[in-house]
């Protein structure tokens, strides 16, 4: 298979071969064929890879007491421009926003044909990209897999493609302005929202007034378009073969033509014309159901990998990290399962390991992984709402903010405002808690936020809570469900279960200590000062205390039963 792919390189004009040396000096790179069948949804796929990470550190001496560096290893990557890749889920969120117009919306996608191989190399680099084969030397003149520089270059080039397609779609919409009353009303509302947000006309056009959204992950394009009927600027219907055209189809065709003008081609077998469903990067985006979910083939593959690890009991650290990373992606469509990975991640970070950098799975780690395997084969098919990452604006009904803080030596406090009331919860650390040196400030900060959430959100009638904290570790535990310690893991597990039961959603925000004044005062025995300042704003103060099941740090220390019973609040 490797020889077949190497010969294809010459047949396609991507490289030259033969026994006559094409240049000097010349470097022959190791190469391999990578099986990407699983990643390709079970469809057989094999990719030729030039291994520019060879020689590995310490393999070949350089004669001066050091070792010969690989091509990848000698690159100064810190000097490269930073490039962030998009998430496929953003297309689902964008589709939900477009659906708010009341008009039909379609999703569509494409995949570049041999994307890397379209890009050439600088002539000064060609000598180091040769391959030795039975037919002589082959000089690979195009970008390849296995080169760190090519991966960066090609992903940055996709930014240009996305920009060009957006401009082309904007030109289409200018030539064929919408006449759908619901869309026109929606655009006017968004135009006003853009003005109130202080957006420039350019930003407003891109972020508020676009009739389409597109993102490109390397060469995988995914998009959503409003699908209204097309009229030209004079109001005449745009017809094709006796049928009036729709915007999404013209957007799709325009994107493919823009791709062609930039020297690329779309893989026809992977094109996804406008419809209610699109598959991208392991996700299914389903507009008819209003859900996003992990593709079935990928769920089954993940479950099989989990089964293998659980059965073995101990596993190489790199293999475990690979599987856990896949499950983190799966958790994007099943957030409740994120805490199930805590024990396994704890095993990864453990200082003690078996020989050969192998990791021994604890009973809790196996239990969490088994829950994931069962979920991947069952209820996870429901997925998450399209706009699950979006959050209502502060001030809308059922939406509010909880500010929390903790001091290391005094106590904790949290507050929110409901109507003309300041709801305040606070308390002091016990002597036992102060004597416990393992009870670190990050845990105290997370506890303060948790107590504020469970005590105040129900009292204020909040379904959507902006949680403000000034501690980065607590922020990470709440936002990414990535707690650092066993106590924090117990809190995250309990608060996640509570939010799911209560139908409460949380958006975590960072606030500086200076701006977190009332929570800071309350945590330092300054409740009286908070009450005095609240009175200046004509706010009545009502004290609310959480149930003991949430306040008990004994349950946190033991890691069992925290927040599990007696969740009623006391006043």
Residue ranges and their predicted role:
Residues 6-163, 242, 293-346:
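Catalytic-core region of right-hand nucleic acid polymerases
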Residues 88-99, 157-163, 442-464, 492-502:
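Metal-dependent nuclease catalytic cores in nucleic-acid-processing enzymes
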Residues 135-160, 191, 244-246, 308, ...:
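A short, polar/acidic, helix/strand-boundary loop motif
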Residues 57-72, 118-121, 180-262, 284-293, ...:
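Catalytic palm subdomain of template-directed nucleic-acid polymerases
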Residues 279, 283-288, 502-560:
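C-terminal functional segments of enzyme domains
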Residues 214-220, 225, 233-236, 454-517, ...:
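RNase H catalytic domain
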Residues 274-390:
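C-terminal reverse transcriptase regions that engage the nucleic-acid substrate
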Residues 1-22, 87-94, 158-170, 238-266, ...:
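Inter-domain linker/hinge segments that demarcate the starts of reverse transcriptase
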């Amino acid at each position: 298979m490797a020889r077949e792919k190497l010969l294809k390189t010459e047949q396609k004009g991507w490289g030259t071969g033969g026994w006559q040396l094409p240049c000097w000096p010349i470097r022959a790179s190791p190469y391999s064929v990578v099986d990407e069948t699983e990643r390709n949804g079970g469809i057989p796929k094999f990719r030729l890879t030039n291994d520019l990470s060879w020689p590995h550190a310490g393999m070949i001496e350089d004669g001066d007491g050091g070792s010969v560096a690989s091509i990848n290893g000698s690159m100064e990557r810190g000097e490269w421009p930073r490039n962030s890749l998009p998430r496929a889920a953003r297309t689902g969120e964008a589709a939900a926003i477009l659906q708010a117009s009341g008009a039909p919306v379609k999703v569509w996608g494409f995949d570049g044909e041999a994307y890397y191989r379209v890009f050439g190399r600088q002539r000064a680099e060609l000598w180091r990209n040769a391959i030795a084969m039975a037919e002589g030397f082959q000089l690979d003149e195009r970008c390849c897999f296995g080169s760190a520089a090519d991966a960066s270059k090609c992903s940055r080039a996709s930014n240009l493609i996305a920009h060009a397609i957006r401009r082309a779609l904007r030109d289409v919409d200018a030539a064929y302005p919408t006449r759908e009353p619901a869309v026109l009303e929606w655009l006017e509302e968004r135009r006003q929202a853009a003005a109130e947000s202080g957006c420039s006309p350019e930003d407003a056009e891109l972020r508020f007034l676009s009739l389409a959204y597109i993102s490109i992950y390397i060469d995988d394009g995914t998009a959503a378009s409003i699908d209204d009927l097309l009229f030209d600027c004079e109001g005449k219907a745009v017809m094709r073969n006796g049928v009036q055209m729709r915007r999404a189809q013209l957007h799709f065709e325009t994107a493919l033509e823009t791709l062609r003008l930039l020297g690329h081609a779309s893989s026809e077998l992977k094109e996804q014309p406008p419809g209610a469903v699109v598959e991208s990067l392991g996700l299914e985006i389903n507009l008819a159901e209003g859900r996003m979910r992990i593709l079935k083939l990928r769920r089954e593959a993940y479950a099989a990998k989990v089964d293998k690890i659980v059965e073995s009991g101990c596993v190489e650290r790199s293999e475990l990290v690979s599987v856990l990373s896949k499950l983190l992606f799966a958790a994007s469509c099943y957030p409740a399962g994120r805490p199930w990975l805590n024990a396994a991640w704890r095993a990864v970070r453990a200082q003690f390991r078996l020989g050969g950098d192998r990791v021994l799975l604890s009973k809790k780690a196996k239990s969490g992984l088994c829950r994931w395997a069962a979920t991947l084969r069952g209820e996870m098919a429901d997925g998450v709402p399209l706009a699950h990452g979006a959050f209502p604006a502060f001030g809308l009904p059922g939406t509010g903010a909880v500010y929390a803080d903790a001091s290391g030596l005094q106590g904790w406090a949290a507050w929110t405002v409901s109507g003309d009331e300041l709801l305040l919860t606070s308390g002091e650390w016990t002597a036992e808690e102060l004597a416990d040196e393992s009870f670190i400030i990050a845990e105290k900060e997370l506890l303060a936020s948790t107590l504020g959430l469970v005590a105040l959100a129900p009292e204020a009638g909040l379904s959507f809570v902006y949680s403000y904290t000034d501690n980065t570790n607590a922020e990470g535990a709440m936002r990414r469900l990535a707690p650092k310690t066993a106590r924090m893991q117990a809190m995250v597990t309990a608060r996640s279960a509570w939010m799911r039961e209560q139908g409460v959603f949380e958006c975590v925000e960072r606030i500086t200590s200076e701006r977190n004044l009332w929570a800071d005062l309350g945590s330092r025995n300054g409740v009286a000062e908070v009450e005095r300042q609240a009175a200046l704003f004509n706010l009545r103060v009502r004290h609310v205390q959480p149930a003991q099941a949430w306040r008990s740090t004994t349950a946190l220390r033991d890691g069992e039963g925290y927040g599990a019973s007696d969740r009623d609040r006391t006043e």
